[in-house]
């Protein structure tokens, strides 16, 4: 009987405190309300997700289009630290996503300092995504990532 080499998931589909099931990449299904409250709920959800038996948190730090232009302001040090701590404590790697150009260099640097490992991904949203690693390469340079910072499947 075979096994998967690794497991990954994201926090882009969840039910908010009002009971609304959301897919964050679909504006018609997303309910933001107060952006600060939304972010607190999102980080709570990310922390829950990375306690599951997964290896990689993908599409990390993704924000819906409605608030994406507030990324740096909404991803506060406190929120970053909560997420990074959960990743480190659970041994979950963080994807550097070329399609969405996330997470930010600030987040990557904090995660690296905490011992979090990294992977690269594209989200395979279309032909333009495949084989593109421009953002990952940019972050390798900007954050001083080395092969030792990368996540590798066991076995």
Each predicted region: which residue ranges?
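Extended substrate/RNA-proximal surfaces in nucleic-acid metabolism proteins
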Residues: 1-89, 141
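Charged catalytic cores and adjacent phosphate/nucleic-acid-binding surfaces used
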Residues: 71-155
């Amino acid at each position: 009987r075979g096994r998967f080499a690794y497991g990954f998931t994201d926090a882009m589909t969840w039910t908010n405190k009002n009971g609304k099931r959301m897919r964050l990449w679909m504006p018609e299904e997303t309910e933001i309300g107060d952006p600060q409250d939304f972010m607190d709920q999102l980080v709570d959800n990310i922390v829950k997700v990375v306690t599951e038996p997964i290896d990689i948190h993908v599409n990390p730090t993704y924000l819906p289009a409605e608030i994406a232009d507030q990324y740096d302001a909404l991803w506060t040090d406190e929120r970053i630290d909560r997420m990074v701590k959960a990743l480190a404590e659970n041994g979950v790697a963080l994807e550097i996503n070329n399609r969405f150009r996330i997470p930010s260099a600030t987040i990557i640097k904090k995660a690296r300092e905490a011992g979090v490992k990294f992977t690269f991904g594209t989200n395979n949203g279309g032909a333009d995504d495949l084989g593109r690693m421009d953002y990952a390469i940019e972050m390798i340079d900007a954050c001083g990532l080395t092969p030792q910072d990368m996540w590798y499947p066991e076995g």
